[in-house]
Structures are given as C-alpha cells and as structure tokens.
Amino acid sequence: MLIVGKNDFKLAPVVQNDPNGGGLYFLNIVKRTYAIKDDIGSLEAIPEEEQPDIVGAKSYKDDYGRSQKYPGDSGACKQLIDVIINGCAFAPEGEAVEELDVTINIAGKHKTLRVFGNRHWERNEAGGVDISATQPFTTMPIRWEKAFGSLSNRWNPLGMGSEKDHETDPEDPLFSLPNVENPEDLLTQFGQKVRPVGFSAIPEAWEPRRSFFGTRSAYWSSFRAPLPPKDQDLRYLNAAPEDQQFGDLIGNEIIILTNMHERFSEMAIKLPDSKPRLFYVPRKRPVDLQDTELDLQDTELIETYLKLDTVVIDLNEKFLTLVWKGKLESQINVLDTFLYMYGVEDSCEPSKSIGEIQRKFEEEIVALEWAREMIDENPEKKINKVVSDVTDQIVKTLKELKADPALISLLASTATLDEKEKMLRAEFDNLKESLEKDLMKQKEKIRSWGNAPSTNFEETN
C-alpha cells in the first residue's frame, strides 16, 4: 500500500471486522497534533517529523496513580465527538485559596467543577463526624484520583472519599475527602455517595462504559467474540464524560477555560478550522501487496468521508490533538486495491472539487514516477539517498566514540560517496586501534592487582 500526499498528518488504515457480520473493512484514522504556543492559547501545527503516532490508550504512571491519560486512537467510529481535557486548577494570581471553580465552555455547553484543598473527615466533641478545615492550595491536578471514588466504586476505582486510604492513621477509621466535586452535588454528610466528576477520559472497564459494552455471556465469548455483543450500546465507544460529547464540531469553535492556566484566570483555545480530505483509488488492474507501481490509468479518486472523532487538550504538556475517522465499506476489496492521498482544507473556504484534486493528484504521480526513474537510471543517487537517510545516526555514534570532527563534518557535506567511504574506513581503523590499546591497558592493570601486596580492591585500585 502506498500513501501519496501531505504528510503533516498521521494516517493509519486499520483492518477491522464489521460487527454486523459484513466482513472486513478499512477504518481510516487520521491524526494531527498542534502545540499550544502561548498564553492566549494560539495553536501551531507540530512539524511533520515530530507528529505523534496513532497509538493505543495511555495511562499516567506517577505518584498520584494510574488513571487514563488519553484514550486510544483506534476503535470504531463514535456517534458523538469526544472532547477530553487534562490539566490543573490554579489559584488566581498564585495566591493560595481553600476552594475555587474551574469551568470549560465548549460550543454552548458549560461545565463547572469545584476544587478544594486537602480535607478529611474528623470526629467532633459530640461523637459525630464533620469535615475538617481545608488546607489552602495554589495548584491541584484535575484527575480521577482526586475525585470521589474507591476501589469498590465502579465509576471511579481510583478515587477517594468513600473508603479509608492507605496513608490514614490505622487508629483513625476516617479518611480523606475528594478534591474535585460537582458544585451541585457536594459531599456534606459522612457516608454520602456522589457521582465522580472530571474532565478526563473514562476507561472502558469503568461505568458507564462497562454497562454499555453489552452482555458478556458464555455464548458471546464462545461464538461471537472478538465481535462485540449484539446488544452493545454504541455509547460504549465514547471515552469523554457524557457532558463533554458533541454531535458536531466543524472547527472555529472557541473553548474557554477558567482557572486552568498558571498566570491567567481565563484562557481561550480556538479549534483548528482545517480538516483533512482522504481519497482512495480502486486500481484497474490486478496487483499484489508488494506492488507500488503507478500509472495514470490508476488515478480515479473516490472520497471517503472523514468525521471528527476525538479532541484531546493537554494543558500540562501544552498540545491539542484531533483525530478523524472514516470507513471504507466492506464490499471493497481491502487487501490490495488502494492508494491513498489526503490534503487539508479550511472549513471556512469552499471545498475543492474532485476534479481539482484529481489534477493535483495526477501531477504528484507524474513527479513520483520521474523520481523513480531517476533513481533507477542512476544507482549512485539511490545509494547516496540511503547514506543520507542514516547519516544522522552515524554522526551520533561517531560523536559518542569521540571520532575525528573532520569526519563528522565530511559526512554532513556533499562529498562523494567514495570520499566518505575512504575516510570512514580510516577512522574506524583508528578507533579500533585505540580501543585495543585501552583494552591492553586495562588487562595490565588487572594483572597488577594480583601482584600487589594487599588484595583489598579499594587500596589497590
């Protein structure tokens, strides 16, 4: 399979099973990541070579716990768009507070969380239980570990507030309260149960996603898996909290975040108004999986619709990621018939016609064929291209070996292949001789230890 076109996106065509028994199909996953560049939330596309790959779900691994950091990029198309936000609450102007509200406002949806400093349940003089004084804070992570929950809580097994935590005094049966709560459903009484709240991704094994998966029966595991249960609710695919799921986001939407920036009480991030367009080419002649030949009879572009699937905003690491997905229907031969090309358009501009993109695509094919012919006709150019591809790694290794700086400069120059090869051989001979001398010195040193009056290593070393 050959991918032609813009590469500042990550593209992965993934073969999947149709859950309705329709056979295999291609799920096209397109991903683009932007850096959040400055204090007002402007975005800049990350360079092509630094674009993060399409990956599975990732979790935190730190002192707070192991909650999910990002959902996986693969998986079937969602009915609603996930918007997931990772970040912290910051006290305005850096002055410690006991509590504050953090809010997100996206496309008319407004969500507020109340963030508290550390608290715990404590016994009063009458033998009852009260909430302790709140410790002021300047920064508080907004994560599931800081929300209501416990190991036995199906909605948040990593949370706090309903079971004694491991750091509590063993003589004290009481425990910490959560730092992150719903301002409309606050904990006020000992033993009260509330729903965990947050902005982050919900793992598949937690509620409500677990119940949406469907019936896990012996029949399912024996006769239908790995296809999902027939009674699966497609809401299972969404990882964002329900109030962070959207029917449509076209770009240009502004996300306003309050008390989630270390210096400013309000931050606005405008979603990119550009989106990729993806096409496939049904070839007109039989091909095998190794075939990368192109000709102009193979350029009938057919567009596959891409829908925005997931938005991840990570304010801690300062990036925004968009993931689109599009499905090629199962009746298409997915194994050997496709050639992909994708480009980007601003949503505020008129879409280019298939004819315009077809002409551009044909120009790219002609350019590729010309480059292929040049390499085939000139083997030295092909060899030099290979050498160029590995030069960075060679230079890095030579620097570690403290090679001649002149050699390193030569490798980065436009010297001929013969000149580079000659100097490389000479330098490696020198390095080999130097290493052999060092080895002999070490052997002599070890022998001297055996002849020394004392056998104490520290004294003879």
Pin down the residues of each PLM region.
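Extended intrinsically disordered or low-complexity segments
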Residues: 2-380, 385, 392, 451, ...
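Intrinsically disordered/low-complexity terminal segments and short unstructured peptides
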Residues: 291, 396, 413-415, 454, ...
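Residue-level detector of alpha-helical secondary structure
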Residues: 365, 369-372, 376, 384-391, ...
